[in-house]
């Protein structure tokens, strides 16, 4: 989040904290929000008593007699541990951050309000079936029961209050849960930024060069289910996308996941093993909250017995297992967002063209309340002119949103009147024009009904029936059950296009590029008990070229998938165990480096130090472990190779820079086979034409110098974990710019193994060194395996899991950061299941009483 640091740059807050430390009151302030986890508590609204057992990791297992009480208690427990996180995310989802953070988040609120996440969620609420509504309301009632009894909800509330930002939390509602889901859908199903970046790249280097930077999925990587010039000005729209991504932790190539399921035919126990590790932006606290939801006796009144991972703010379990089935989820990466170029009426900007006729856009007015006075923005005069009230220190703004048949116009009002020139797909762009967004998540859906049906499902047919309601975000589901079956299913609304492939903005003034429907559920990719005995997904292509529908052209390039499959295949001839699955989840192999090294190894050096450095690197086992010196040297070389190859053409616009992951790895692999390709030439040098070997030599020389500068002269002191570190930052106050405040909330840096496009997917962003100084280079982890889960069907109590930080969102709670160390060293805790195991491992026992 780039804009929030300005919020707390206030000397008064620093002075307050110092006084609190000196006075000894800081301990009380940080302890007072800690929840009661033992004994008994009256919770009005419950029908019967509920037992909450927490294990040594703070994971609650909830036992209730009705689904009402079960979800009531889940809401209560989420609020105990994570209410600040819930408050922050509901403000993101509803576009209400500026009520707290003022000008710094206004552009993001405008963007979310323009899309209308809350408007769509309100439509979804009207469509809820009785059971789903009942259970969502029970959850909300549990949250509110906790709010009614607590005054100190979190240290964040206290420190913001010291800044004069008093937050009186509103009651939790079903709508808050539904808007929260829109924020997650944005993280997991957006390719709008890809369209906009593609436009910028084509404008900069041309269509052919753009294709070389983003090559198609390679034919030698696994498939899950075998079988022009543009004159658009998209910079403003892309800035809005990136600002929202900064808040949610998404929007770059590290977002993905691994999952796989192995038939009992290949395991030592004869029962299936299922594994999952979703990759999301690094954050504090963890996005996941582990929980067990158990009906004391399964019945129509209480049909749940499930454990796994939930989101604080939503009922149920998103990933996990119940008494009969287990499921894991990875991001499908479908193309479900399209940008349409709308032709506006120059005499009436509220009208747009449809097949030769002017049509009135529907205008919706969104009222945004902003803390403080809004700073005038000459680029956005209509959305920064408001009414300021001195007594409340707030400004009220009116945002008029125009809705086309495709969706909201996402440009600001003055931008809409500007001329977009040129052509798209060979069609001249009329003037004036604007961009409208069509996205499946902006249409009402039934995903929460799907989640709760999934938690209740008892077999493969019920599993598939639950996923029929899973509208967004489209995901890869792997499945196993107690009968020994394994399966795969793609769910979700994936559009069928009359024309086009979703890669670039398309004309919206005719029907030529309309969505004609969605791929029917029964025609979405699936597999059941495949002959190879396993199914693995890692955001790679799920279908081959013969599949009749377009799902995406933006697959992960398959390095992780290839390694997972190779490791499973390598074990054939012996039976796989849980230890094998742990080894796969923690694998640090860099397959791309194996492709690059033969070319680098063939380059000669005159300098004895560089010769020695290259010999050192040649002995590397390609594992990016914490203590690997060669891994450190290779990654320093790798980012230099990317910069030396591409930055001269792409310039200083970091939005265009290739990342260090799969797309760039495949692009470089292809270019290495073309020693005289134009990308190797440095266009800023007039006296020579560089070739592949020249750039390899230059990049290694620079990377070797970086290693000596950053890690010391002796390779004996080099280690990947010294460069590649993870810092878990609180999404708001952890980015305050005040060291004392950040120390309260943030944890790290800690050394991390793995890297981009590696199974242990700890991705980093490339930062271009200022003035080419190696000291500015960073490999800070930006995306992580946000949790790891292994389900053992021979005995559910043998299942294992971990997530990134801890169960608690309260700084200084013992469970705020107690999972960081085992997470980074690929260790696990037991994913307890049976009542006997839960009670035997209980650390605390709380009874919630009506």
Residue positions per predicted region:
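Second-shell loop/turn segments in exported
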Residues: 70-73, 120-133, 438, 448-454, ...
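Stable alpha-helical elements in mature extracytoplasmic
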Residues: 93, 117, 132-142, 284, ...
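Hydrophobic alpha-helical segments
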Residues: 406-427, 433, 469-571, 623-626, ...
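Charged, long alpha-helical assembly modules
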Residues: 637-721
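N-terminal Sec-pathway targeting helices
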Residues: 1-20
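Glycine- and hydrophobic-rich flexible loops that cap the catalytic core of alpha/beta enzyme folds
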Residues: 295-309, 314-316, 320-325, 329-512
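Terminal end segments
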Residues: 550, 554-570, 574-610, 696-850
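Substrate-recognition/specificity elements adjacent to catalytic centers across diverse enzyme folds
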Residues: 10, 23-284, 298, 307-308, ...
